Structure formats: structure tokens, C-alpha cells
Design a protein with these regions (language model features):
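Hydrophobic N-terminal alpha-helices or hydrophobic patches in metabolic proteins across all domains
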Residues: 1-173
Length: 173
């Protein structure tokens, strides 16, 4: 079990380092945020919501409502739940085919949840602005982390593998 935890932390640190020093400074992450905002804008169009989507260069994308409410997509990407999920799945033992399928399916679900989180934040800011901070600071992050935990537990079942715990220090009677 300790080996799994060490692998998890090492993989997480590698992913965090790669994201912080290569992906984020290169501007590719902002393309992801722009794509997320564009999807939210399309969902708002499909729902018949009146809004204005503004792209302010590579650092900020905002969606405005008619009453002045707005959502900034910068910082709403949910990159840490992605990192935790990838590290957890990579650290737990299992076959590469199942692992690849789980990573693809899990990342797709996390992306969908991230888009719904931004959409939900917009709708709450428009219709229940008093509850916006509660949703943005507590409910949305808790929902994303809970999804990561459920996906990881699903992976532990699907993988069909268990880490080697070694010999138990407790002897049976």
C-alpha cells in the first residue's frame, strides 16, 4: 500500500510540475478554458438564456448576463481534480488497456462535470446571486472531488488488481 501512495505522490508531482511549468505558460491551458466557455455559451443558447460571451485574450474569458451577472472561466477549469484522477489511476495496479479506457472515460466525465459546474455557476449568479459564493467556493469543488473519488473507487473495481500489502503484522489466532 505504501508503494501505491508513493507512486501516487510522485505521479501527481510530475503532472503538477509539467502543468505548472510547461502547459500553463505555453497558453494551451487557456485554449482549454476558451473551449469550455464556448461550450457553456452554446448550452446557454440551447437553453434560451440571454447572454454575451467575451474573450479577453489568452487570460480571461467571461460570459455576461443581461442583468450584469457574469462568470469568468479563468480558474474554473478544474485542473487539480484532473491531476488527482490521473495520478490515482496511474498509481493503482491494473492492465494498460483497462487503465487507458478508464482514463479516457473518467477525463470525459470530469470535463462534462467541469462544464456543468461553470454553467451552474452562471445560472446561480443570474437567478440566485446570494448563493453564488456558496456554490463557487464549496459546492462545485466538493462535487468535482467527490466525482474523482467515485471514479477512483470504480477504477479499483474495474482494474481487478490489488496492491501487494506484504505480510500482515497481525497473526491469526
Amino acid at each position: 500500500m505504501q508503494l501505491v501512495l508513493i507512486r501516487f505522490f510522485l505521479i501527481f508531482l510530475l503532472i503538477w510540475f509539467f502543468f505548472s511549468f510547461f502547459v500553463s505558460p505555453s497558453g494551451h491551458y487557456f485554449q482549454y478554458q476558451e473551449f469550455t466557455a464556448e461550450l457553456v455559451a452554446k448550452l446557454l443558447n440551447a437553453m434560451g438564456e440571454d447572454h454575451l460571451w467575451l474573450y479577453h485574450g489568452e487570460y480571461k474569458t467571461e460570459i455576461y448576463a443581461r442583468d450584469g451577472a457574469h462568470i469568468s472561466v479563468a480558474g474554473s477549469g478544474g485542473q487539480y481534480p484532473y491531476m488527482f484522477f490521473i495520478a490515482a489511476v496511474m498509481a493503482w495496479p491494473g492492465g494498460w488497456l483497462r487503465r487507458s479506457a478508464m482514463l479516457i472515460a473518467g477525463l470525459a466525465l470530469l470535463f462534462s462535470a467541469s462544464v456543468l459546474t461553470v454553467l451552474g455557476a452562471y445560472m446561480i449568479d443570474v437567478y440566485h446571486p446570494v448563493q453564488f459564493d456558496l456554490f463557487k467556493k464549496y459546492i462545485a469543488p466538493t462535487a468535482l472531488v467527490s466525482l474523482v473519488i467515485v471514479l477512483f473507487f470504480t477504477w479499483t473495481v474495474i482494474s481487478g488488481a490489488k496492491p501487494d500489502f506484504g505480510e500482515s503484522p497481525v497473526k491469526p489466532l
